[in-house]
């Protein structure tokens, strides 16, 4: 199965590459796109969904990657991490959406714990993705 996680506002080239690869793959393909919607309560407004997607990727909330099994046939690592190391503030990203910001008003004592856990989980995912992307760069010795 070909799998990609994309965000149009974050990297249009990565999105187009993923769609092209997904279409070319001779089997099922799954492309998961980050799509801000009105229920997110983007404080900048719905006219800023592309910018919000970029913020999600820059903060490490959403990671961009592609998994193309065809690369394995070429002796290459099938997993490609397209996201850079997160550089923006994770909590600042969360607070830019009403769905998260409202939690600080309704359950302030729990909100901070949940935000910290969400950030830790996102960082763990990124580290796992980095490890997967590095796997193909290490030569593997064939057993005799």
Give the ranges of each region predicted by the language model.
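Conserved acidic/glycine
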Residues: 48-144
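Glycine-rich ThDP/TPP pyrophosphate-binding loop and its adjacent helix/strand module
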Residues: 1-85
